[in-house]
Every structure is written in C-alpha cells, then in structure tokens.
C-alpha cells in the first residue's frame, strides 16, 4: 500500500476527493502528518471514524524501519533505515550554528560510478519514492521532537544521483516546502548533482529558489572523465553552459564541491585551472577532505597541500572554504555505514 507521505497537499486533495471526501480534509490530514506529526491514522482525532478507516484502508504512514543509529560527539547522527522491500538507506542529521540539517538519500545505490565514492560499490538498485524521501525527514524530525528541535535545512546529498530521480525529488521538495506542512524554505534546501546538464536546465526553470551544488572534483575534462564517468556524457563545457543558464534564471550563488584527493586533483597547477573555470561564476568552492573508502586506492590530500590549494583560490578571489568533517568516527561519509552493514549481512548469508 502506498505511503501517505507520497502526496503533497495538492495531490492529497485530489486523492481524497476521488475517495469521496471534501478537499479541505486534505489540509486537516496534512496538519496531523506534518504539524502534529502523529504516527497513526487513529491519532487524527478531529476526523470522523469513517474517514480514519478510509485512510487506513488506502494508505500507510511510516514505511521505514530503523536498523541502526550512530551518534557522534558533535551530535551528527546517522540513521540506517530499511525500506519495505528490504533496501537499506542512510539518512544523516547534522547540527550547525544555524540549525539542524538532514542529508537524505535519493536512490538505493547509484549508477554514476564515481571512482572515489563508496555508494558506487553497491550499484544502482532503484529510485526512492517521494514518500520515502519525505519519510526520511519525518523520521529524523520525530527524533528531534524529543529534544524540541526542528529540521531547518535539507541537503539532497546522500547516496544516489537526485537528477536521475528528478520527478520524485521534486515532489518531495514540494511536500516539505509547503507552508501547511514542514514549511522548510526553498532557500534552505540544497540539491547536489554530479552534473546532469539537461536536468540542471529543467531544474532552473522549475525550482529556481532551491540551492544547487555541483560535484566538480576536477578542473579539466581529462581528469574529470577519469574519476567521474558522467563527464563522458556531459563534459565541462556542457555542464557550465547549463550552470550559466541556471544562474541567469535564479540569480543564486552556486556551490562547487571539490574533494581533495592526494596526488590526484590537489596540485597548484590544478588549483590554477580551477580558478580559470569558476572565476566567471557567482559561486563558492567547498574544499572537502576526502573520506577514505577501504576498497579504493584514493587517499585524502595532505593538510599542507589542502592549505596551499585553499590559499591559491583565495588569492585569486575565488570564495572558498575547507569544510570541516563531521561525524567521521561513525562512518558518516557517503554510503559507508550502509556498505559496512551490507558487508556484514552478506558475510552472514
Ligand atoms: N550524486 C550527487 C549527490 C550524492 S554524493 C552528487 O554527486 O553530487 C554527495 C557528495 O559526496 C558528492 O560531492 C560526492 O562526490 C562526495 N563524495 C563521494 N564520496 C566521497 C568520499 N569518499 N569522501 C568525500 N566526499 C565524497
């Protein structure tokens, strides 16, 4: 049965009307789901018994089960969740000085095959539904409710390529963004993509207030193609053409993510190429210390190289930060917890 978290307010109105209900009921149900955050239809006490029964016959609520939770000293918390079909996904909560953000998974596994990433080791299995995306936020929000805190920001930066699951990700955003629901502002939501150029343009047309982050990781086509096969589909020229289009439409500052990998993309020559590539954009560069993945040969850059790379960008007027690592002691990086649990499971089989 379909989870009711799959419906944004508009679609819930349509669905309830089809079930013979007045459209305003959808607002009441929405409020129970997202403001009062109940766990069952029986708790929706201002609805008639008949309507509650009808809801129970047609929908389920929570479809995710907690398999494992790990919390680090800095309050980063990682939830390993199991979907109804047994698929495992990871959701991460992070505390910042500006609030709490949740990093959601958009696909079970990933087909993009970036060489440095742990998610690719698991291959792509399927897209998550909009309801499974919303459910991840609700799972974490209900946990935060115990501390009377609220999810203020969302990053679609977990396992998967969100722009290969575009319609579901957009429905998810419409749902959490709704002011009758969680009311998380578009400007507090960031989608990260490895660079699916045509979808970036579509996104610019439809969701121009949502932030966009691009996983760049290399300053030229030769290197980028080596470590990110997506570059053979959409090279840097096509990617940047789409990004200029996005900036024209949205006027928003872009984020470039650049993982620093020892001896691969962390030289001063590469910093120079990176400056050339991004200097004409309204953007900042997030330099991210690479998180080691046991199964592949890449290692994090040396701190002195990271510092030199950062200084070079700064001196050439590229806005950038070296992002602090959060929760590395809990396998918080990119598919690592899930990969580790799957390894244990298959060892047991
Ligand atoms: N598919 C999307 C979102 C998921 S990956 C994208 O590519 O943007 C989220 C970010 O983590 C990406 O920038 C990705 O390149 C990066 N990443 C993957 N593996 C990593 C690792 N081992 N250490 C640090 N960052 C990693």
Residue ranges and their predicted role:
Residues 141-320:
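Conserved AdoMet/S-adenosylmethionine-binding subsite of the radical SAM
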Residues 93-94, 168:
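Residue-level structural signal for beta-strand termini and adjacent loop
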Residues 1-89, 244-253, 260-349:
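Auxiliary Fe-S-binding modules of radical SAM enzymes
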Residues 71, 84, 94-96, 145, ...:
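Short polar/acidic secondary-structure junctions
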Residues 77, 89, 100-104, 112, ...:
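Generic beta-strand structural signal
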Residues 95-138:
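Canonical Radical SAM [4Fe-4S] cluster-binding loop centered on the CxxxCxxC motif
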Residues 9, 111, 196-198, 220-221, ...:
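Alpha-helix N-cap/helix-start and coil->helix boundary motif
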